């Protein structure tokens, strides 16, 4: 079975200096190499560890962005449980989520501030982290890289709720990457391939296959 750490390290050896993610910022596309992405993941993971969030449930409540990808990989691989939720959720849904799964922290986008403020009034002990503070932390030797069990829950996603109440689904790294090596053999990728992220990252396909695979 494979883990996020193994995938990041193996891919960094091959694609470390290659462009990995392009994000449109103020009308222009800014590129990040795979090596820069891995460094940002390690840097943010070490910051979350210092904040005492190891083993905790951390929600990501924001639209698609490079910072979202960094946060998701950092939490799942080295910190705790990434709880990915739709940026369209209401304040009432956030409050219900916080109560049901005992949320410990939330990374939120700028457009979600009003909803997050409503949550903050009810749950002062939750740690609130603006998503713009995620990337850019230098990786340090203080990162402990064996705190997360690949067979335990690393990610919680929710069904769409179109036919009823959204249902939480718990995934381990072993679940998520069970087919990773087979896919690499069947559809080998190189730096000339282009993958367009067309779904929100809280979707299972976008957040796993479209991004991490």
Q: What are the functions of these language-model segments?
A:
Residues 31-34, 154-180:
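Conserved AMP-binding A3 loop
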Residues 87-116, 179-196:
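Conserved ATP-dependent adenylate/AMP-binding module captured primarily in the ANL superfamily
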Residues 20-52, 56-65, 69, 73, ...:
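Conserved AMP-binding/adenylate-forming core of the ANL superfamily
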Residues 38-43, 169-190, 195-198, 208:
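Conserved structural elements of the adenylate-forming
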Residues 16-19, 140-158, 165, 188-194:
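Conserved pre-ATP/AMP-binding loop-to-beta segment of ANL
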Residues 111-150:
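ANL superfamily adenylate-forming
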Residues 74-78, 206-213:
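Conserved short alpha-helical elements in the N-terminal third of ANL/AMP-binding
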Residues 1-20:
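A short N-terminal helical cap/helix-turn-helix that marks the beginning
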């Amino acid at each position: 079975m494979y883990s996020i750490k193994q995938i990041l390290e193996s891919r960094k050896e091959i694609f470390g200096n290659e462009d990995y993610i392009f994000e449109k910022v103020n009308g222009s596309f800014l590129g990040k190499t795979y090596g820069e992405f891995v460094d940002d993941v390690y840097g943010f993971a070490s910051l979350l560890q210092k904040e005492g969030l190891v083993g905790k449930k951390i929600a990501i409540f924001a639209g698609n962005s490079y910072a979202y990808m960094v946060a998701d990989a950092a939490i799942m691989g080295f910190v705790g449980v990434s709880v990915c939720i739709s940026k369209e959720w209401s304040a009432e849904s956030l409050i219900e989520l916080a109560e049901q799964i005992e949320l410990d922290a939330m990374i939120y986008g700028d457009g979600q501030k009003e909803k997050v403020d409503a949550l903050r009034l009810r749950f002062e002990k939750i740690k609130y982290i603006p998503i713009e503070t995620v990337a850019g932390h230098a990786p340090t030797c203080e990162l402990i890289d064996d705190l997360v069990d690949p067979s335990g829950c690393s990610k919680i996603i929710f069904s769409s709720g179109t036919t009823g109440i959204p249902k939480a689904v718990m995934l381990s790294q072993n679940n998520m990457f069970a087919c990773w090596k087979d896919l690499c053999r069947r559809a080998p990728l190189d730096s000339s391939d282009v993958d367009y992220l067309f779904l929100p990252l809280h979707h299972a396909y976008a957040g796993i296959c479209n991004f991490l695979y």
